[in-house]
Structure formats: structure tokens, C-alpha cells
Amino acid sequence: EYILFDDCYMSTVEVAYDLKNVTNHLIASTCEIMAYGMPYAKIGQYLIGEINYEKICNGFDDFYSNYEMPCGTIAVTDCAELDHLAAIMKDINSQYTFDTTLTGSLQRLDGYSPVIFFDCGDYVSKLCSNQELLAQFNEQLNRTVPFKRNTEYFYSMSRGKVKIETFS
């Protein structure tokens, strides 16, 4: 039914696409996850039996919003939707080339230098100027990632707290 990663940087479109034929859903963080890891005492009941992805995300967010270092992101990816997302991305990529001067304006999701993890929706919003195609992408992204939550900041061991302006 699902794979839950209690690890950093596993909620990326690349990871999801690689595993799309292995599982129905991925539950993971886009960023570094605090040493405490997944708050199983809060979300465990939603992981067993009748899975409730929304409550998993809400429980994670509730826990980390009140944690000593209130930083965290979680997302659920519906792997059945990934081919549709890839088809729209193929269309966008065939029409547009990313202006690398905009790289610094993208929502970073890591502490690396140079940055290697960005918010996918933010990237596409700066790549695609066709509003109709961008709307199609965003609608499909919302179907592909139906549940997600984030605190105001994410934590990076190398940068400390980093503000989250966009989380898709």
C-alpha cells in the first residue's frame, strides 16, 4: 500500500517516479528530518489498518509545530498519478528552458551549496509562462501530492532554520 521513509530528502518527484511501480503511495519528507524522526506515537494509528494519509500529515505537522525545533515537511505522493504528471512535464519541458538566473529565487529545500533540492511547483511556476499549461500542471500536482504539511521553517544542519515560502 505505501512506503514510509523516515529519512531525509525522500519526498522528491525523482524518488517517487523510480518507485511508482513498487507502491501505491509514498510518505516522506522533502527536507532534512529532525533526529526524532517520524512521530510514530502520534501517527502510528493512521499507518495501520485503514490508512489515513491526511491524519498522518496532520499528526506530523502537529508534532513538529510544537517540537523544540519546530521544523518539518511531510508529503504523501499518489504513485498512480505520476505518469500524468510526467506527461505534463514533458510538454512543459519541450516548450520551455529554465532561466538559470532565476535559480536563486526558487524555494530551496536543502542546506547544500549549491542547492540541489527545490520545490517542484515553484520551479515549474518559474519555468512555464503559459498560464493554462501551468494550471494543468498545478491541478495534476495536487492530484499527485494530495496531502502535505509543512512548518514555517525547515531545518538544515548546515544552514539552521530556513523559511518555507512555497511548499507544493
Located regions from the model:
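Terminal, contiguous helix-loop blocks that mediate binding/assembly
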Residues: 1-168
